Amino acid sequence: QVVFDKIEECFDDQKKSNKKEFALLSMDIDFFKSINDTYGHPGGDEVLKAVANTLRDACGENIVGRVGGEEFIAIIESKKDKTLEEYCESIRKSVIDLSIPFQDNNINITISGGVIKSSEVKDQEEFVNIADERLYKAKEGGRNQFIYS
């Protein structure tokens, strides 16, 4: 809920003061069901923790949160002099670089995401819905990627 409250706050601020554009990333761990099926819920939990920590580190001062299951959302207000595409690519690579130790294995994963800029929409509901639609396009298009349109 904190993430959705922050989205509302960002839209309100943008309307009041012509605040700079921000973006929403809707992200999902690829093939998470297979991870749970292979390693059980304890293995899945380790993956979720590792991804949450990695996203938190990769997103820095930006807001990131888990919104259910294996889905995460990030609100990107600061990109540290990177383009949005470069920023998302660095997130994707940081997840790929994970090697999550579990029992006698190392679990490797990828992440897919849908991206939208606040300038593309008029309200927060449309903002979230379009990001989710783009996430599904990323999944259908082969996974391990971010989709921007």
Each language-model region and where it sits:
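Conserved long alpha-helical elements within nucleotide-processing catalytic cores of c-di-GMP signaling
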Residues: 1-23, 30-57, 65-69, 73-74, ...
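Core hydrophobic beta-sheet residues of small sensory/regulatory alpha/beta domains
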Residues: 24-26, 148
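Residue-level recognition of strand-loop junctions within catalytic nucleotide-signaling folds
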Residues: 37, 75-79, 96, 118-119
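Catalytic-core segments of nucleotide cyclases and related cyclic-nucleotide turnover enzymes
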Residues: 41, 85, 103, 116-149
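Short glycine/proline-enriched coil/turn segments at helix->beta-strand junctions
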Residues: 58-63, 80, 120-123
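A short pre-motif secondary-structure segment
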Residues: 63-66, 107
